[in-house]
């Protein structure tokens, strides 16, 4: 069927900010969809609130709106633009929920807008647990015994009938938010209450736990002619019970017999047909390992995290084709973009094994509960490709960016059998490593299978790795053993340690013996047809399929998995850099390992290598391609950390030299450079021992800011108020020694300013200066940023511009630099300089229209700023106000403290723009998920040092009609200031207390600041966590609170009696 001609304009709904459960995969799918629709001649309008994405670039769609994804704002855009149709299935759960809301509000009907791809009835049938169960019964497809519940009493009824354990699945939520497995009544109360709160329709499905079954996923496509295919099937190494986003996944499935494969394939196709989905869909199934009994777990009637993985695993671009199907094209009409010969109705075939391992944020949140269940906790993931599962798995392990090069962790070697058993049964992020350790210690596969029901096939693969370790250790210097180890994916790093040599020695030994990997192509058809895709993976085999051209090439290093501190912003910069390299006439080669991102879409670069970002894996590619050089500026700390080793191998680092990178990162060299340039910085010194640290802190005076050198996202950074806190930090947060010094600075409580600039060594161009709402001390990634600055005097702005230009030239920066300043007592100090792309590059690029990563790349390739039409100086400021607001995923991470500080905690960001600061802030806050009601109650519990500041805030809340609630101490201070307040009981009270008010939704805001100078009081922690669990905005910074007040005041009309007004005027006359 040809494409539809009765529609011209299509609105694509994006997925909003990155949160746990919804990461960069929707930037990839949304970008693909917009391009796909434009190819077909449609006018595309995009709405998304996330400025850090390629999707929100003006070139992606005909019109791009960066606005909050709420009914209020999306309706406004629909009424203004009058699209013929909307496509919500590429915007994740956010897009689907938005479509349902728009339909129910009547806006779509009012404006005559049709939903494309998946009909509203199909969305509701798949997402509403009750409707889905009914449909499965009609199809005769088995689902676990279950019950839809709307309150706790109904939950008790089901459990009494079926017994524990039961799984709670809330309706219309993302990444299993609010759900979990209940083994007893206490867990049932907690999880059901949470699930009902998080479900927008207050509905949960309770089902008998089938934990222990194999979890299998099918990624299926269907068109309007009822052609349906399986793009890829995947198997979770972790049995049912762990969310698929937190599971280690392999593709294609490894343990299914042909009969099982066909049985589940037929079921998946039957379900997509019954739902009438036109596009992509993900079906999750559970299979009993001892019989042919299976269950349908759930269906995602949209493009998902799994479809991004399936696209990258097979090379089959699901989102691109789903968009074409949505406008009426059929699979047998669409040419497969990979082979450019076959049609999209051919099911992909794989002649390799793909492994995906999630990347969790537990290195950031030491206190988080690491147990894995049905609620997702990973922020991102890595993927790797190999010719066997062992190779694929070990490549994925070293892609995780955790400093791990093998399936072993030193701290697990001490575990006894009982502890290992407990942790394997319970399942946490280290389970696979513990399985390997158990096998090393002689535990049998039978015992491990009994503990966690992991399939014997996977346990055998882990045992193969362990047996190979023994071989390697017993045969030092043996080339045959080395060859076998390399074929199994062992790293040079591991072999070097086993043979007591350096990694470089092993690398040289292999080269002398012609033991190097070849590169194979990902072609969707297992080499059955010739393919045109330049998409490769390494393996130890015979024939190399990556043909080196005679064009000059440049390698760009990607940023690896999405994690806190290094998000999709770096992928944005990477993609723009690749485009600039191509524009400059070079061949652009990218190395990355994140299946969710735009940079790993094979159509972006001239060549894509899907490989771990380690020195060994990167050097294999450089040895083959012999590029002009490597760009490390855009891949975050991942790429910067490889620069020194690459240079040791004789590789040219393009842009800022290694020496100058080091000068910005090394404390003493940086201090010397600032002194020479006459630029002030907070007093600080470097410590290499605990004793030194104590002495420095005494000399500088508390409070001090302590952090390790070479970090991203403020990892292990803290503000310390006294000596015992410093000792606690030195013991628990860092391992200090000569190679890993700790930086200790005077902590200045001032206004923080952030600047991004581009330097060519002679000229320094500054696209924008941003002001942070939160004072210095809150990580820049967690602060609300405002552009242009609202409270900087011209004199201070001039100082900042002068310092930026001096730093760009003085540090010999070629490319991008990011500087953080603090304004303290009307003086500008430099806190730090990052000689690379920062997380504000996409935000500023979009606002100012300066494509920063593109310009910087051309500078790196030798085209100076003047040639590109830019000179030295500050870009004229925009008239509108733009706000970048952080977005957190605290609801997914139990027992993590939500207090903001110097260590980054946000997972994503949104943008608000309007004519005034108040309006822009309102949009930014609403887009980030904070509800801003114009009246209600606010709970105030603050530390003594904040009481004075809190009084002014409380007074302003009172004046706009808010009801104030406070515990005795704060209430007394308020009463003394004649501010009406209601006293509430502290949380340790048996009577109705502060936590009850939060639980019952009787407070709209909670203001809670930390008591400094002692370990965080558990009371404060419980108040903050209770707020998160119950969806109440908890403000831990008084600066953020003031920003919200500005918005509330701008939305509220004043109401004063005439007498008050005349009294005020009389007072003014008397004192005039």
UniProtKB/Swiss-Prot annotation:
Residues that coordinate or bind Mg(2+) 1: 284, 298
Metabolic or biological pathway: Amino-acid biosynthesis; L-arginine biosynthesis; carbamoyl phosphate from bicarbonate: step 1/1; Pyrimidine metabolism; UMP biosynthesis via de novo pathway; (S)-dihydroorotate from bicarbonate: step 1/3
Domain ATP-grasp: 133-327, 671-861
Keyword terms: Amino-acid biosynthesis, Arginine biosynthesis, ATP-binding, Ligase, Magnesium, Manganese, Metal-binding, Nucleotide-binding, Pyrimidine biosynthesis, Repeat
PROSITE patterns: ATP_GRASP, CPSASE_1, CPSASE_2, MGS
Co-factor note (free text): Binds 4 Mg(2+) or Mn(2+) ions per subunit.
Region (Carbamoyl phosphate synthetic domain), start-end ranges: 547-929
Binding-site list for Mn(2+) 2: 298, 300
Positions of Mn(2+) 3 binding: 820, 832
Pfam families referenced in this protein's UniProt entry, alphabetically: CPSase_L_D2, CPSase_L_D3, MGS
Residue ranges constituting the MGS-like domain according to the UniProt record: 930-1072
Binding residues annotated for Mn(2+) 4, in chain numbering: 832, 834
Residues where Mg(2+) 3 binds: 820, 832
Region (Allosteric domain): 930-1072
Residue positions binding ATP 2: 707, 746, 752, 777-780, 820, 832
Top enzyme class: ligase
Binding site for ATP 1: 129, 169, 175-176, 208, 210, 215, 241-243, 284, 298
Carboxyphosphate synthetic domain: region residues: 1-401
Chain sites annotated for binding Mg(2+) 4: 832, 834
InterPro entries recorded: ATP-grasp, ATP_grasp_subdomain_1, CarbamoylP_synth_lsu, CarbamoylP_synth_lsu_oligo, CarbamoylP_synth_lsu_oligo_sf, CbamoylP_synth_lsu-like_ATP-bd, CbamoylP_synth_lsu_CPSase_dom, MGS-like_dom
NCBIfam families in the record: CPSaseII_lrg, PRK05294.1, PRK12815.1
HAMAP family in the cross-refs: CPSase_L_chain_A, CPSase_L_chain_B
Record-stated family: Belongs to the CarB family.
Protein's name according to its UniProt entry: Carbamoyl phosphate synthase large chain
């Amino acid at each position: 069927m040809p494409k539809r001609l009765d529609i011209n304009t299509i609105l694509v709904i994006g997925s909003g900010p990155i949160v746990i459960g919804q990461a960069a995969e929707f930037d990839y799918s949304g970008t693909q969809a917009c391009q796909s629709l434009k190819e077909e001649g449609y006018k595309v309008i995009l709405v998304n609130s996330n400025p850090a994405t390629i999707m929100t670039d003006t070139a992606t769609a005909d019109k791009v709106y960066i606005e909050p994804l709420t009914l209020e704002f999306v309706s406004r855009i629909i009424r203004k633009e009058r699209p013929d149709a909307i496509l919500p299935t590429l915007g994740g759960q956010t897009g689907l929920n938005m479509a349902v809301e728009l339909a129910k509000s009547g806006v779509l009907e009012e404006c005559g807008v049709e939903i494309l791809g998946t009909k509203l009835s199909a969305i509701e049938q798949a997402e509403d647990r009750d409707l889905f169960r009914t449909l499965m019964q009609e199809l005769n497809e088995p689902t676990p015994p279950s019950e839809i519940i709307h309150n706790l009493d109904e939950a008790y009824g089901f459990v009494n009938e079926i017994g524990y354990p039961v799984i709670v699945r809330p309706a219309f939520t993302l990444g299993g938010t609010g759900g979990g497995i209940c083994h007893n009544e206490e867990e049932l109360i907690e999880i059901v209450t949470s699930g009902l709160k998080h479900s927008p329709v207050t509905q949960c499905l309770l089902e008998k736990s089938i934990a222990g079954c194999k979890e299998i996923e099918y990624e299926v496509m269907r068109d309007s002619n009822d052609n349906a295919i399986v793009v890829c099937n995947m198997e979770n190494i972790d049995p049912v019970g762990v969310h698929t986003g937190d599971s280690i996944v392999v593709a294609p499935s490894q343990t299914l017999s042909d009969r099982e494969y066909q049985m589940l394939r037929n079921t998946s196709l039957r379900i997509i047909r019954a739902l009438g989905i036109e596009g992509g869909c993900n079906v999750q199934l559970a299979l009993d390992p001892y019989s042919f009994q299976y269950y349908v777990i759930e269906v995602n009637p949209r493009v998902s995290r799994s479809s991004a993985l399936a696209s990258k695993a097979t090379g089959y671009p699901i989102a691109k084709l789903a968009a074409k199907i949505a406008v009426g094209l059929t699979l047998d009409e669409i040419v497969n973009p990979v082979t450019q010969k076959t049609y999209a109705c051919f099911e992909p075939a794989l002649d390799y094994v793909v492994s995906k391992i999630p990347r969790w944020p537990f290195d950031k949140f030491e206190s988080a509960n690491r147990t894995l269940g049905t609620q997702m906790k990973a922020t991102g993931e890595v993927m790797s490709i190999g010719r066997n599962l062992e190779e694929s798995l070990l490549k994925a392990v070293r892609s995780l960016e955790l400093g791990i090069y093998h399936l072993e962790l030193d701290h697990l070697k001490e575990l006894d059998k009982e502890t290992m058993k407990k942790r394997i049964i319970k399942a946490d992020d280290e389970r696979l490593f513990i399985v390997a350790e158990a096998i090393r210690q002689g535990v049998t596969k039978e015992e491990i299978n009994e503990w966690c029901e992991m399939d014997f096939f996977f346990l055998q693969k882990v045992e193969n790795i362990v047996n190979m370790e023994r071989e390697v250790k017993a045969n030092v210097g043996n080339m045959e053993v080395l060859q076998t180890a390399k074929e199994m994916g062992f790293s040079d790093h591991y072999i070097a340690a086993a043979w007591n040599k350096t990694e470089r020695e092993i690398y040289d030994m292999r080269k002398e013996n012609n033991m190097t990997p070849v590169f194979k192509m990902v072609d969707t058809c297992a080499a059955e047809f010739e393919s045109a895709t330049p998409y490769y993976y390494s393996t130890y085999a015979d024939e190399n399929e990556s043909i080196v051209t005679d064009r000059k090439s440049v390698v760009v290093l990607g940023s690896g998995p999405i994690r806190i501190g290094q998000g999709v912003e770096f992928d944005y910069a990477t993609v723009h850099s690749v485009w600039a390299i191509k524009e400059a006439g070079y061949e652009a080669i990218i190395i990355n390992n994140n299946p969710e991102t735009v940079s790993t879409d094979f159509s972006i670069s001239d060549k894509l290598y899907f490989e771990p970002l380690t020195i060994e894996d990167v050097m294999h590619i450089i040895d083959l391609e012999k590029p002009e050089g490597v760009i490390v500026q855009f891949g975050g700390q991942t790429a910067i950390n490889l620069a020194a080793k690459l240079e040791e191998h004789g590789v040219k680092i393009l842009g800022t030299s290694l020496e100058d990178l080091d000068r910005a990162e090394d404390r003493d060299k940086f201090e010397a450079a600032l002194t020479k340039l006459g630029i002030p910085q907070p007093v600080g010194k470097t410590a290499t021992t605990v004793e030194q640290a104590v002495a420095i802190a005494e000399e500088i005076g508390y409070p001090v800011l302590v952090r390790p050198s070479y970090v991203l996202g403020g990892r292990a950074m803290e503000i310390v108020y006294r000596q015992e806190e410093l000792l606690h930090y030195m013991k628990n947060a860092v391992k200090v020694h000569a190679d890993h010094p700790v930086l200790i600075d005077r902590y200045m409580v001032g206004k923080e300013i952030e600047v991004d600039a581009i330097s060519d060594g002679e000229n320094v161009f500054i696209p924008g200066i941003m002001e942070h709402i939160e004072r210095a001390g809150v990580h820049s990634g967690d602060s609300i940023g405002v552009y242009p600055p609202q409270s900087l005097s011209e004199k201070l702005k001039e100082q900042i511009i002068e310092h930026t230009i001096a730093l760009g030239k003085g540090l010999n920066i070629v490319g991008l630099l990011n500087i953080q300043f603090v304004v303290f007592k009307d003086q500008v100090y430099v806190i730090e300089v990052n000689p690379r792309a920062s997380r504000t590059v996409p935000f500023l690029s979009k606002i100012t229209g300066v494509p920063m990563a593109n310009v910087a790349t051309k500078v790196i390739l030798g085209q100076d700023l003047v040639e590109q039409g830019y000179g030295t100086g500050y870009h004229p400021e925009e008239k509108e106000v733009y706000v970048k607001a952080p977005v957190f995923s605290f609801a997914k991470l139990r027992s993590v403290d939500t207090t903001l500080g110097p260590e980054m905690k946000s997972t994503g960001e949104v943008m608000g723009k309007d004519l005034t600061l108040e309006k822009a802030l309102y949009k930014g806050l609403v887009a980030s998920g904070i509800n801003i009601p114009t009246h209600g109650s606010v709970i105030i519990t603050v530390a003594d040092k904040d009481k004075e500041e809190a009084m002014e805030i409380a007074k302003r809340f009172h004046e706009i009609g808010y009801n104030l609630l406070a515990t005795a101490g704060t209430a007394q201070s308020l009463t003394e200031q004649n501010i009406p307040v209601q006293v509430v009981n502290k949380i340790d009270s048996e009577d109705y207390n502060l936590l009850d008010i939060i639980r019952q939704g009787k407070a709209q805001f909670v203001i809670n600041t930390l008591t400094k100078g002692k370990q965080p009081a558990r009371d404060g922690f419980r108040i903050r966590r209770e707020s998160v669990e119950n969806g109440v905005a908890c403000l831990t910074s008084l600066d953020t609170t003031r920003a919200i007040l500005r918005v509330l005041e701008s939305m509220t009309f004043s109401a004063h009696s005439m007498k008050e007004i005349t009294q005020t005027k009389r007072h003014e006359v008397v004192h005039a």
